[in-house]
Design a protein with these regions (language model features):
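Short, solvent-exposed loop/hinge segments that bridge or flank secondary-structure elements
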Residues: 25-67, 106
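Edge beta-strand at a domain terminus
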Residues: 51-54, 121-134
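Amphipathic/hydrophobic helical signal segments and adjacent flexible N-terminal regions
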Residues: 2-33, 41-44
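Glycine-rich, low-complexity intrinsically disordered segments
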Residues: 7-9, 49, 130
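Beta-strand secondary-structure signal
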Residues: 33-37, 117, 130
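Short, exposed beta-strand-loop hairpins at the edges of beta-sheets
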Residues: 105-109, 115-128
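Contiguous, well-ordered beta-strand patches that form the walls/edges
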Residues: 67-104
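Short hydrophobic/aromatic-rich beta-strand segments that constitute the beta-sheet cores
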Residues: 38, 66-67, 71, 114-118
């Protein structure tokens, strides 16, 4: 028991400060700057209609491997700005964000084909957009 107490005291006395305990920067860093153009809007089970929805995605990605990065970003449109997080694998990207009232999901394939959906709790209702992001 005395040894355990000494160990705890030593650990507490030598614990690094909060500033010193921050994680080192990831070896692979990347700036995210993507322009999307969605040309179809689908509301619930109604027929899809043509649209012109052009949000921009900006942010940063980092990770231990260039092939799998964690992403923190914002999607900015005329309607709103949504904080989104997710992963980037090679050229494909998957992001989620929003709050309980409106959950957002953006999927971008390696070739740029993209789907963006918003799920609203009130209703509930879902709106989907089809287009490209590059």
């Amino acid at each position: 028991p005395a040894l355990a107490q000494d160990s705890v005291a030593t650990t507490a006395a030598t614990a690094p400060s909060a500033a010193a305990a921050t994680a080192p920067a990831e070896p692979f860093q990347q700036t995210i700057a993507i322009a999307c153009r969605f040309t179809w809007e689908c509301v619930e089970n109604e027929p899809c209609t043509e649209t012109e929805f052009t949000p921009d995605i900006t942010g940063n990605a980092g990770g231990a491997s260039a092939d799998a990065l964690t992403v923190q970003s914002q999607m900015v449109s005329d309607a709103e700005t949504v904080d989104m997080t997710g992963t980037k694998q090679v050229k494909a990207l998957s992001l989620t964000g929003g709050g309980f009232d409106a959950r957002h999901l953006l999927s971008i394939a390696a070739d740029g084909a993209s789907r963006y959906t918003v799920h609203y709790a009130d209703g509930p209702i879902v709106i989907s957009y089809l287009g490209t992001c590059k």
